[in-house]
Amino acid sequence: MAAKGYEDAIISEHAASQMARRGISVALLKGVLRKPEQVMEVRPGRIILQSRARIGTHNQLVRVFVDVDVSPAQVVTVYRTSKIDKYWSEQ
């Protein structure tokens, strides 16, 4: 799936609360939405945008789940993980 910018996506209330709880800034989220390194379809209408980021002293993978079957697109949730190899697609 080709990378496309989703910077106009609305951040759901759930996603905003998860960002606050997980220490993910709006700037980091917007960066992934604007220019994701990878885009994967979970199911029709929902995609995952992900990018690697240096957070503190650690390399992390930021994963953003977006519903694209609504207009504008809506960020459902976002999290970061150190398990880059588990989720990174080499395709």
Residue positions per predicted region:
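Ribonuclease/tRNase effector modules and their secretory precursors
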Residues: 1-91
